[in-house]
């Protein structure tokens, strides 16, 4: 999965898909009442990027629905969306409410109330383990609204670079048993080692681990891309999807990796 980083403006959806992304990451900021408000990152952000691009969340999600509905030229090119949920602005007790409001919003504006809505898989990426009730609030709301089937399209990620054991315990608290992606990384302005990504991959490949897929961010340089692939990740989040595509075509990688398609299930652990 080639995950276009910080796609917060409607025009950028096309831009990143055209460069080779089959997945995008979008930042979601919340208002004081825990409603998803903007797709916005703000400063500081990755080196070389404009941190201030934004849309109203509803407008972005409607455009995303259009892009990921059969008949659209992007439909079979873009099939995974990571919502990077900026819950740091919320009180801990608002996490469940944020999940409820996010679910209602996506149900209406993305899934079109279950009537021929967008088809991409969605990952809810949460920066704080304490906010795990966002997941339970989200799940319960879709069930209450009569659309539990949409949870088949939803996965989860804790993005705070916490200890993998703590992450696993938090999923147990939330009652999550699958659809788990694990991120690891740091802004492209800095370097980060591979210790934790290796631990995440080990959990993914172990008999009793909860992780299904592992991705690393933000990977922009050619050598870092190679090092990341050598760590056996499932996804690379990048500002330059065309560089990831280029490296995947190198002799060392083209037989070992392939770019995911719409037919690939992002919740299934890949077994060699």
Swiss-Prot record:
Give the cofactor binding note: Binds 1 Mg(2+) ion per subunit.
Cofactor(s) for this UniProt protein: Mg(2+)
Q: Which reaction does it catalyse?
A: an N-(acyl)-sphingosylphosphocholine = an N-(acyl)-sphingosyl-1,3-cyclic phosphate + choline; an N-(acyl)-sphingosylphosphoethanolamine = an N-(acyl)-sphingosyl-1,3-cyclic phosphate + ethanolamine; a 1-acyl-sn-glycero-3-phosphocholine = a 1-acyl-sn-glycero-2,3-cyclic phosphate + choline; a 1-acyl-sn-glycero-3-phosphoethanolamine = a 1-acyl-sn-glycero-2,3-cyclic phosphate + ethanolamine
* InterPro entries according to UniProt: PLC-like_Pdiesterase_TIM-brl
Q: What GO biological process term is on the record, naming one? A: killing of cells of another organism
**Entry's Gene3D superfamilies?**
Phosphatidylinositol (PI) phosphodiesterase
| Subcellular locations according to the entry | Secreted
Primary role: Dermonecrotic toxins cleave the phosphodiester linkage between the phosphate and headgroup of certain phospholipids (sphingolipid and lysolipid substrates), forming an alcohol (often choline) and a cyclic phosphate. This toxin acts on sphingomyelin (SM). It may also act on ceramide phosphoethanolamine (CPE), lysophosphatidylcholine (LPC) and lysophosphatidylethanolamine (LPE), but not on lysophosphatidylserine (LPS), and lysophosphatidylglycerol (LPG). It acts by transphosphatidylation, releasing exclusively cyclic phosphate products as second products.
Q: What is this protein identified as?
A: Dermonecrotic toxin LvSicTox-alphaIC1bi
The species is Loxosceles variegata
